[in-house]
């Protein structure tokens, strides 16, 4: 299979969406979204997005793209009064994504996926939601 960024996006979505504990923390299905929550979003919800992607990071000849290193962001939105809800969601996401082989599936070989950065939650004054942004670094290839 040829490399396509869609493959890693699908692996991230599937890993998050297929976890019943995370769906329970989110209050049901349909709350894991790509890029931006709609104005009428149900809270809590999370978005995910690939923010950078570099091919063949372990070789000077990057033309083959055999190993890819990507950074992606998962952002949690919660309209709870306190951060406990978003903290619990973040902890579950870390359990799912942080480590070796966490995004392996039929198309992806995930060499490792580690939480690279966690920003302290902030309260959006317009939407009155807590926003927690987490950046992950993943090294992967296609099968």
Region locations from a protein language model:
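Extracellular/virion structural assembly segments
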Residues: 79-99
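Acidic-leaning, charged glycine-interspersed low-complexity segments
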Residues: 95-143
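Divalent metal-cofactor coordination and adjacent catalytic microenvironments
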Residues: 49, 68, 111
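Oligomerization/assembly interface segments of phage tail-like spikes and tubes
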Residues: 64-80, 93, 130-140
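Short, cysteine-centered beta-strand-loop-beta hairpins and adjacent loop/turn segments enriched
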Residues: 55-58, 77-83, 140-143
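Small/polar-rich, solvent-exposed N-terminal microdomains that initiate assembly or binding
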Residues: 1-62, 84, 100-106
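Short, well-ordered turn and helix-capping elements at secondary-structure junctions
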Residues: 52-55, 80, 119-122
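Sterically constrained small-residue positions within well-ordered secondary structures
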Residues: 39, 63-65, 123-127
């Amino acid at each position: 299979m040829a490399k396509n960024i869609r493959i890693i996006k699908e692996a991230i979505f599937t890993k998050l969406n297929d976890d019943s504990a995370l769906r329970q923390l989110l209050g049901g299905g349909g709350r894991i979204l790509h890029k931006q929550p709609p104005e009428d979003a149900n809270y809590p919800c999370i978005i995910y997005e690939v923010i950078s992607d570099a091919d063949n990071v372990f070789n000077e000849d990057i033309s083959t793209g055999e190993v890819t290193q990507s950074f992606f962001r998962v952002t949690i939105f919660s309209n709870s009064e306190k951060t406990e809800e978003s903290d619990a969601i973040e902890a579950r996401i870390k359990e799912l994504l942080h480590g070796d082989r966490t995004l392996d599936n039929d198309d992806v070989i995930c060499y490792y996926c580690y939480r690279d950065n966690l920003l302290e939650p902030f309260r959006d004054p317009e939407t009155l939601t807590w926003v927690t942004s987490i950046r992950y670094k993943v090294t992967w290839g296609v099968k």
